[in-house]
């Protein structure tokens, strides 16, 4: 097994309070060849990440104008962040202004929209939020399922956007991402091991189906509070979906903007080709030393067909169909 220092800080267990250590000792646990996971409120977390989740739940002070971008890992999070930043930024900087000063050209979307669990509450229970004091709305992000995440909102009606993606493409994207940050070759045996874990519901932030269902049901119960978006629809009808996102966030496109091509300009600014080609995303890193370029790969729908066997496809499809039965959520 990898030593502690070889693991990403989110996957270690060196930042735990005594209270959290005691809690973990009472939780269901799982250990693969590299890291330990524990199941808290129905979701699997690395130990340090669980500490961050608890810190967030207890100490975050929401504002009603906050915008929270949620997703299961490797579901189009970077793209959702870029689009949301660009939509909100229009109120401060129209596209006709100097484009070179746009924040997306000088920072990665993950640098602009921090994760509660990784960027804010991982190292401290009381992060400094003063840099957001002049921002309205404030943009944050999370991978927590809705029922866990809502504890930190303390009843606030702030906007929550969830991006959902086909689990098979999520799996392939996660497989490639793990290989990048661990500097290992893309291994078929690793994919097969990850596949079995995914099917068993044991993965970082898994089970996938419970995660998606939490936001799906939340969007049905309170559509003004939670917007459920699909990665595949973003790819097939980007203009329609960006308009939908902008309206939900409270920054709808005017007729003049639509007529002048603002939606197309925004989509081009946030495109994989444009963002991945920027110097900051070719050479920059997160504070956890992840290369920004590792967040950009193919972004394709259906890439899983190049990697999963028909038997694997059938197995995971049957599991998803069973787990989502009666919910009206389909893939």
From Swiss-Prot:
Coiled-coil annotated residue ranges, if any: none
Q: Would the keyword Nucleotidyltransferase be found if you checked this record's keyword annotation?
A: no
Q: What residue stretch is flagged as signal peptide?
A: none
Where the protein is mainly located, per its record? cytoplasm
Q: By what name is this protein known?
A: Cytosolic sulfotransferase 1
Query: Which residues take part in binding 3'-phosphoadenylyl sulfate?
Result: 74-79, 165, 173, 231, 297-299
The record's function comment reads: Sulfotransferase that utilizes 3'-phospho-5'-adenylyl sulfate (PAPS) as sulfonate donor.
Per the record, the similarity remark reads:
Belongs to the sulfotransferase 1 family.
Checking Pfam families in the record gives: Sulfotransfer_1 (PF00685)
Name the Enzyme Commission number(s) assigned to this protein: 2.8.2.-
Q: Does the keyword Transferase apply?
A: yes
User: Catalytic residues per the record?
Assistant: 143
- What is the enzyme's class at the highest EC level? transferase
Single GO term (MF):
sulfotransferase activity
Q: Name one GO cellular component term.
A: cytoplasm
Highest rank taxon of the organism: Eukaryota
Indicate where this protein resides in the cell: Cytoplasm
Q: Which UniProt keywords apply?
A: Cytoplasm, Transferase
């Amino acid at each position: 097994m990898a030593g502690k220092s070889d693991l990403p800080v989110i996957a270690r267990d060196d930042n735990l309070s005594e209270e959290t250590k005691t809690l973990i000792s009472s939780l269901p646990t799982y250990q693969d060849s590299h890291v330990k996971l524990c199941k808290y409120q129905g979701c699997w977390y690395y130990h340090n990440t669980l500490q961050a989740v608890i810190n967030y739940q207890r100490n975050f002070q929401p504002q009603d104008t906050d915008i929270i971008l949620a997703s299961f890992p490797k579901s189009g999070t970077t793209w959702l962040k870029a689009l949301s930043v660009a939509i909100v930024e229009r109120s401060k900087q129209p596209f006709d202004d100097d484009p070179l000063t746009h924040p997306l050209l000088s920072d990665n979307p993950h640098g602009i929209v921090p994760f509660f669990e990784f960027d804010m509450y991982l190292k401290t229970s009381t992060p400094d939020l003063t840099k957001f004091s002049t921002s309205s709305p404030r943009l944050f992000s999370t991978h927590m399922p809705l029922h866990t995440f809502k504890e930190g909102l303390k009843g606030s009606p702030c906007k929550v956007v969830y991006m959902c993606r086909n689990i098979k493409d999520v799996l392939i994207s996660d497989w490639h991402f793990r290989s990048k940050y661990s500097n290992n070759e893309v291994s078929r045996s690793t994919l097969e091991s990850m596949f079995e874990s995914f099917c068993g519901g044991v993965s970082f932030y898994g089970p996938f189906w419970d995660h998606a269902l939490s936001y799906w049901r939340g969007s049905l119960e309170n559509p003004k509070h939670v917007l459920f978006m699909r990665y595949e629809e973003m790819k097939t009808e980007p203009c329609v979906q960006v308009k939908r996102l902008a309206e939900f966030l409270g920054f709808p496109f005017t007729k003049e903007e639509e007529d002048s091509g603002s939606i197309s300009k925004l989509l081009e600014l946030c495109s994989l080709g444009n963002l991945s080609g920027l110097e900051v995303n070719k050479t920059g890193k997160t504070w956890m030393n992840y290369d920004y370029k590792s967040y950009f790969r193919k972004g394709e729908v259906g890439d899983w067909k190049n990697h999963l066997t028909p038997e694997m496809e059938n197995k995971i499809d049957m599991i998803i169909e069973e787990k989502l039965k009666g919910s009206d959520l389909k893939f």
